[in-house]
């Protein structure tokens, strides 16, 4: 079963950076959900999520971000996706989520969204 690898770091200006690699689906979404919950508990609500190495995302995986964006925005933050792979971006488009989330091609562009 494909897995999910996550890396988290804190950038200047209180921005949290998460890099996801592998598969974000019904079997792995709880890992991402737990990481975002931990970041929120630390008071970080500005998230850049790099999806360049994410091979697959299901509706359950995308649902993690749908559930988190309201809390982020309610606390003065947001979620910005950095360099989503074409197949991942297509899932966001098909689910109608591209209108809700911001996407960036460079880290500077992503940081400027805040």
Question: Language-model features: where?
Answer:
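STAS-typified acidic loop motif
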Residues: 2-34
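Short acidic-hydrophobic, aromatic-tinged amphipathic segments that line or gate anion-handling sites
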Residues: 102-106
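Acidic phosphotransfer microenvironment of two-component signaling modules
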Residues: 86, 108-109
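Short acidic/polar alpha-helix capping motifs at helix-coil junctions
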Residues: 1-3, 10-11, 54-56, 74
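Conserved catalytic submotifs in the C-terminal HATPase_c
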Residues: 12-13, 52, 108
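Amphipathic alpha-helical interaction surfaces in cytosolic regulatory modules
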Residues: 23-100
